């Protein structure tokens, strides 16, 4: 008889693997535990003294406001709060520049009470905030079941309490043999067609959860994807994550800019997201200190708007 790995076994193996990659396992049963851990990580990340209850409540009230898209912008901004002595303090939620210099934790089976009670499989926390949700299904089940499950979480419980689960940037769905990722957004903008397999540089799909974890969920790579390779589309209020071939193209262009004065080009087919690749490349290059100006040229007016 074939030994079919259960969902619970898959979850246990994933947690062990993530700990090997440098994630700290933390027990978080509910929102109260989540908030207590977030407060501690926020203080450590910003190297500040312990926040008073009043100060922390201020911060939580600011973080609670807005849609998924608004919270994605908040994640990337410095936030202010009034200290008990009436001076102004500032906090960062994530290091956008030295993206490896963040704190990585993992937990599982967090239960949140909203319209319905939901218990999530595996949650990756960066500086105490839940930024990646991994939904697992046992081998043999369709991957779309995991996709639909994350949509139910959004409808039923992600916005409950202080709504910190709406800070999720990426979802990972897997049945062990097929594994895909996609960006968080409002439910009306989500589509199973916009879930992607990760690949290597030769475009070989990495479908097994174990292999995907080693490559995509490596702490530095994951935070690079979140800080560098998610685009906030203001025209549609949605988050867009680059596909692997776009990621590798941008990485090579940026490398060429940093290391050489020679020209180069990237070849993409129609409908492959060339404009997004070009935009993200330009955005990253503008952050290089030695680059004074980046000229972004399009050949049609509709691309300029896009």
What are these regions (language model features)?
Residues 2-298, 302-306:
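ATP-dependent helicase/translocase motor core
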């Amino acid at each position: 008889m074939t030994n079919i790995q259960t969902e619970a076994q898959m979850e246990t193996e994933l947690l062990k693997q993530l700990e090997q990659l440098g994630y700290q396992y933390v027990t978080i049963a509910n929102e109260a535990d989540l908030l207590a851990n977030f407060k501690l990580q926020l203080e450590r990340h910003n190297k500040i003294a312990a926040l008073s209850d009043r100060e922390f409540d201020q911060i939580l009230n600011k973080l609670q406001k807005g849609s998924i898209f608004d919270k994605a912008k908040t994640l990337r901004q410095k936030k202010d709060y009034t200290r008990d002595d009436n001076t102004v303090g500032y906090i960062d939620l994530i290091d956008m520049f030295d993206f490896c210099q963040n704190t990585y934790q993992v937990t599982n089976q967090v239960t949140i009470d909203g319209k319905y009670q939901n218990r999530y499989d595996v949650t990756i926390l960066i500086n105490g905030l839940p930024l990646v949700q991994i939904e697992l299904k046992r081998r043999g089940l369709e991957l779309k079941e995991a996709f639909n499950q994350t949509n139910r979480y959004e409808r039923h419980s992600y916005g409950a309490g202080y709504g910190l689960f709406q800070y999720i940037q990426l979802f990972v769905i897997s049945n062990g043999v097929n594994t895909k990722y996609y960006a968080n957004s409002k439910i009306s903008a989500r589509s199973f067609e916009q879930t992607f397999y990760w690949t290597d540089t030769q475009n070989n799909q990495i479908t097994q959860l174990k292999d995907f974890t080693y490559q995509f969920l490596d702490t530095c790579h994951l935070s690079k994807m979140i800080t560098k390779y998610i685009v906030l589309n203001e025209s549609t209020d949605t988050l867009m994550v680059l596909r692997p071939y776009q990621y590798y193209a941008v990485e090579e262009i940026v490398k060429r800019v940093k290391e050489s004065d020679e020209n180069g080009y990237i070849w993409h087919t129609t409908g492959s997201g060339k404009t997004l690749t070009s935009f993200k490349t330009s955005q990253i290059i503008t952050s290089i200190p030695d680059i004074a100006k980046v000229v972004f040229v399009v050949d049609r007016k509709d691309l300029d708007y896009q």
